[in-house]
Swiss-Prot record:
NCBIfam families: tig. InterPro entries: PPIase_dom_sf, PPIase_FKBP_dom, Trig_fac, Trigger_fac_C, Trigger_fac_C_sf, Trigger_fac_ribosome-bd_bac, Trigger_fac_ribosome-bd_sf, Trigger_fact/SurA_dom_sf. Belongs to the FKBP-type PPIase family. Tig subfamily. This is Trigger factor. Coiled coil: none annotated. Its EC number is 5.2.1.8. Disulfide bonds: none annotated. GO terms for biological process: cell division; protein folding; protein transport. Its main location: cytoplasm. GO terms for cellular component: cytoplasm. Keywords: Cell cycle, Cell division, Chaperone, Cytoplasm, Isomerase, Rotamase. It is an enzyme of class 5 (isomerase).
């Protein structure tokens, strides 16, 4: 095997590899001999399978494994030539050429390494912002939202029609093609009007009903409805309204205050409002960071700092962005890319954005190190569990699915990014200015 390698720049090296047919055959023989000591095969005792029998049945698989082993050895050889360590490698080698001829291999590959990233003066790029002001009206609305969690529906006494936000107690029965269907009937059912728990059109059809009134509501089941025998079909629901209920907010007494402010020895309405004000301010800052500041800062970082990028990572990102764009094209539009020149031209159009994306990833990684921002495995699991609870998934299954997809590193990186920007833009960061103003 011949390996020659040369550094192109700090982050990339070119390597030329030539593996003779004899070297591949010798490696195949070596793997076959090793397998013969443990392999079981009908007609032979375990560990006594002849090498010839193994080669006859598994030569294709052994050749593939042998080539992979030799290419790994070639990478090791290339690293020695350019005086780099395996721990410096990022991503997989990028093959610019890979030819098989007469059982031999000739390849040209690019090995990429972690770039040298220096961010001197990055603090000057952090955008300034005005601290959002929270109004009493917003605090009152937040307080009402909080109290609604402890509210209970109570029947109204006034004579009025059902409106959005009310709770309706009613009987209903559904019919498709004039026939009642399973699961389409209930009595004294309680439903919040406007909650969209029922199929589209049902809750809207109930608005305006008064207690004791009956009505036929015409709806159409969604095409993607879970019960396939009903999906896409027209239906009629016969309903009778028995009671209209409104949420009654609880009194903000000492007992409720204690449950809302368990950390306070002497809880009060004033302390609750102060806590809600702080929450609202943080929510506004978080929104401001995500909607504006983060993008401004990221663009400034990418524009100011320049360093050599790992070619293989850029190529991978280019491929990913290109393939993602193809998913949005029609079959007719996709036909255009059967032309190799147009295919390459379209793929190349994503190169600049890919370079910016890769550069930002390494900048964020370096910033996280500079500011000692980390995400523990426990924090990662908690974030995934929280996501599962939000969407009604089984937490452990949700975590396992991400593991199978190999998505944990990407999720961890996104959490580090979120934590990093929160740290950079936090209130007591002396590297930015704040002015009190109403947002």
């Amino acid at each position: 095997m011949e390996v020659t390698a040369k550094l192109i720049d700090f982050a990339n090296a070119n390597a030329t590899v030539k593996i003779a047919q004899g070297a591949i055959k010798a490696e195949v023989e070596k793997l076959a001999k090793k397998a013969s000591k443990t392999m079981k095969m009908d007609g032979f005792r375990a560990g006594k399978v002849p090498v010839a029998a193994i080669l006859k049945r598994y030569e294709k698989e052994l050749t593939r494994d042998a080539e992979q082993d030799l290419l790994r050895n070639a990478v090791d050889g290339a690293l020695k030539e350019v005086k780099k360590d395996a721990k410096d490698l990022v991503g997989e080698p990028y093959f610019e050429k890979f030819d098989r001829k007469d059982g031999a291999i000739e390849a040209q590959m690019v090995l990429s390494f972690r770039p040298e990233v220096k961010l001197d003066g990055y603090e000057e790029l952090v955008p300034t912002y005005n601290t959002p002001k929270v109004t009493q009206k917003e605090i009152d609305a937040k307080k009402e939202e909080l109290l609604k969690r402890f509210a209970t529906p109570e029947a109204i006494k006034e004579d009025r029609a059902l409106k959005e936000g009310d709770f309706a107690k009613f009987d209903f029965e559904g019919f498709v093609d004039g026939k009642a269907f399973d699961g389409g009937k209930a009595q004294n059912y309680v439903l919040e009007i406007g909650s969209k728990q029922f199929i589209p059109g049902f809750e809207e059809g109930m608005i305006g009903l008064k207690i004791g009134e009956e009505k036929d509501i015409n709806v159409t089941f969604p095409k993607e409805y879970g019960a396939t025998h009903l999906a896409g079909k027209d239906a009629v629901f016969k309903v009778k309204l028995h009671e209209i209920q409104e949420l009654k907010l609880p009194e903000l007494n000492e007992e409720l205050l204690k449950s809302l402010l368990p950390e306070e020895k002497e809880p009060s309405v004033e302390k609750l409002e102060a806590k809600l004000k702080e929450q609202l301010k943080n929510e506004k800052i978080f929104k401001l960071i995500n909607d504006e500041l983060k993008n401004q800062f990221a663009e400034a970082l990418v524009a100011k700092f320049d360093f050599v990028l790992p070619k293989n990572i850029v190529e991978q990102e280019t491929d990913m962005q290109f393939r993602s764009s193809l998913r949005n094209l029609s079959e007719e539009e996709l036909k255009e890319f059967k032309d190799e020149a147009k295919y390459k031209e379209k793929r190349e159009s994503f190169k600049e954005d890919a370079q910016k994306s890769v550069k930002l990833t390494f900048i964020i990684d370096e910033l996280a190190k500079l500011r000692n921002v980390t995400v523990s495995d426990q924090e990662l699991i908690q974030a995934i569990y929280f996501e599962a609870y939000r969407y009604g998934f089984n937490p452990q299954e949700h975590l396992d699915n991400y593991k199978k997809q190999g998505a944990l590193p990407a999720i961890k990186m996104s959490l580090i990014e979120e934590k990093l920007f929160a740290d950079i833009f936090k209130k007591n960061d002396k590297k930015k200015t704040e002015k009190e103003s109403e947002k």
